[in-house]
Amino acid sequence: MTRPKPVALCILDGWGLSERREGNAPLLADTPNMDRLMATCPHATLTTFGPDVGLPSGQMGNSEVGHTNIGAGRVVAMDLGQIDLAIEEGLFAQNSRLRAFIVTLQDSGGTAHLMGVVSDGGVHGHINHMIAAAKALADENIPVVIHALTDGRDVAPRSALGYFETLQAALPDGVEIATVTGRYFAMDRDNRWDRVSKAYQAIVTGTGRKAASASDAVDQAYGQGENDEFISPTVLGGYTGAKDNDGFFCLNFRADRAREIMAAIGDPDFTAFETGARPKWASLMGMAQYSEAHANYMTTMYPKPEIVNTLGDWVAQQGLRQYRLAETEKYPHVTFFLNGGEEVSFDGEDRLMPKSPDVATYDLQPEMSSKEVTDAFVAAIEEGYDLIVVNYANPDMVGHTGDLQAAMKACEAVDQGLGRVLAALEKAGGAMIVTADHGNCDVMIDPETGGPHTAHTLNPVPVVVVGAPDGATLRDGRLADLAPTILHLMGLESPKEMTGKCLIS
């Protein structure tokens, strides 16, 4: 048979499948192009959570996990499960890099500053990791303060008080919460440095809104209409900022939303905003490696495993050309995460990153930059690349706002783009897999509370093959099966490291 060219992978980020109509943006939206694909093309479903993507049972998937598994073509054991197991087996406190952090602070006489998301969402961090780290340090008589990042995005929008109750009941005597900051400020990934600056000032200099306690900070925020995600950086009690010889440990294990705040705290060449005189840190550490640049000034408790012969690497080894495309909110996912944690592009790999719109929240502009992404997608098809990987951010990013009407508009914007892409693909004689990395906007109303649902879901996601061989059918599978399927469409054998199986029969 004639091999299609290009072969494209189109990831509709956060587009899950559910038969429940209430709050189901993809089902309620007007999406004629996606409807046509589901009616006329081979399709099935993929599992994007739990052990099928290297996470603990019942743990929802996310974009980092999803794109890592997609690119690897195998199930990749993720940081959450690795850290959970170490805590369960009593090995967390014995970690050699944590021990080195402890010894350094014993020598310097400084305080350990622990920063991380305080929830059990498990997407960027976990409250249990905060508790384990605080205990490990306090057991060695290291003074500990906590910089709590409230979630409200991967968990219910107003759930922080319960998490603080859990945290404070488990913390050793003497460990204090020094600041409370909504993740909107401290966990930005789109160069919104005005937000990051406010988080930095509270955490490092002790400057910001004041409250007597964590619960007071939350009550104060709710009184001003701020949900957990948006709590203004708040300084508690008598905290006056970090000092020379202190140490800083970021407990978030996901890289993309830890990079900016940690660069502000520790990068010697940081210039994005005026930090003032920073403390002379005795030690800086992250739960995971946030980037190769970060590794120049901070250590890593759990270094990333090497993932060889990823989809992009394997295609490059065959001398073929590939193209990666996403707006800034999802750009790391189709590059860094899809490439198994490699920052540098492979030979023959071109990239484009349209800027995400400069709005406070994406329900205000649910189309985001989908038109620019579609324009570039169509141009890449016409350019003659062998492989194109594209992420549409809208269903996920707007899904996180909890606004059903906006999420429907997001799905419709993506579907309109899909129509243009399909026309260009048919003209070029290409093939395409349309899928998602996890669910999100398929549940916009919490079935238990009736309030907004802002987190990812445990629903399956669609997988559709456009331009499949005649008579082809698809089986249900998992994200690790996508790379072998793409390589099959390209007429390439899979490398032996890819244990995923082709979905086409």
Curated annotation (Swiss-Prot):
Pathway: Carbohydrate degradation; glycolysis; pyruvate from D-glyceraldehyde 3-phosphate: step 3/5. Mn(2+) 2 binds at residues 13, 63, 437-438. InterPro entries: Alkaline_phosphatase_core_sf, BPG-indep_PGM_N, Metalloenzyme, PGAM_B_sf, Pgm_bpd_ind. Binds 2 manganese ions per subunit. GO terms for biological process: glucose catabolic process; glycolytic process. Catalyzes the interconversion of 2-phosphoglycerate and 3-phosphoglycerate. NCBIfam families: pgm_bpd_ind. Keywords: Glycolysis, Isomerase, Manganese, Metal-binding. One of its GO terms (molecular function) is manganese ion binding. This is 2,3-bisphosphoglycerate-independent phosphoglycerate mutase. One of its GO terms (cellular component) is cytosol.
